[in-house]
Regions:
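Conserved N-terminal beta1-alpha1 strand-loop-helix module at the mouth
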Residues: 1-63, 72-82, 109-113, 119-148, ...
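Glycine-rich phosphate-binding active-site loops on the catalytic face of alpha/beta enzymes
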Residues: 76-101, 148-154, 167-190
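A cross-family glycoside hydrolase active-site/sugar-binding cleft signature
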Residues: 5-7, 42, 66-70, 91, ...
Length: 190
């Protein structure tokens, strides 16, 4: 299991799904990224505002760091990249449809897109709601090699084996449980 942290105002915080939206809990302590292996970082200030709020992170250059800063517009990917805080995750949760994802692809060759899951995709735009298989196919058509499925309630989508072998599927979990067999790297937030 890989390490994952959520932070708000330079403090580690707990995060949970209340059935409608992400909510933050107590501030646990200062933000430190010591250790080894991959690290998933949820910048809750950016996620809650739907716009990257770039600021310095005390990153460890020896670790692969994946950063979800939140964004609603394709051009927001520029701010996230320029912050140079690790691999940029483009979240579909608040992006304004395929057009905005395509705009982000104009600015950068994206390595990683995330999809929030609560028995079905959770997204503000109808383009990203519905059949998970079709969503993954659309991402493959756009040459996106890696997708992070954020399981907000402990449930996971059914991914056919043929499709699971075509794209790297990682998982971020907010609750305890066992990841699906198609999961690549598994991160636990909490």
């Amino acid at each position: 299991m890989a390490e994952a942290v959520a932070y708000l105002n330079n403090r580690r915080v707990s995060v949970a799904w209340n059935g409608e939206r992400l909510v933050t809990g107590r501030a646990d302590g200062p933000l430190e990224f010591d250790g080894e292996g991959s690290l998933l970082v949820w910048d809750l200030r950016g996620i809650l505002k739907n716009r990257p709020a770039p600021g310095p992170l005390p990153l460890n250059p020896k670790r692969e760091t994946l950063v979800d800063s939140g964004m609603a517009w394709g051009e927001d990917v520029i701010d996230a990249i320029m912050a140079d805080r690790g691999t940029v995750i483009v979240p579909l949760r608040s992006l304004r449809g395929w057009g905005e994802l395509d705009e982000a692809l104009v600015y950068a060759e994206l390595e990683l897109v995330s999809l929030d899951w609560v028995g079905e995709p959770v997204a503000a735009h109808a383009d990203f709601q519905g059949d998970i298989v079709e969503l993954l196919r659309q991402l493959l058509r756009r040459n996106i090699p890696r997708v992070m499925v954020n399981s907000l309630d402990g449930s996971f989508p059914f991914i056919p084996a043929g499709l699971a072998g075509s794209v790297r599927l990682d998982v971020a979990m907010l609750t305890d449980g066992h990841p699906p067999n198609w999961a690549g790297e598994v991160f636990r937030l909490g």
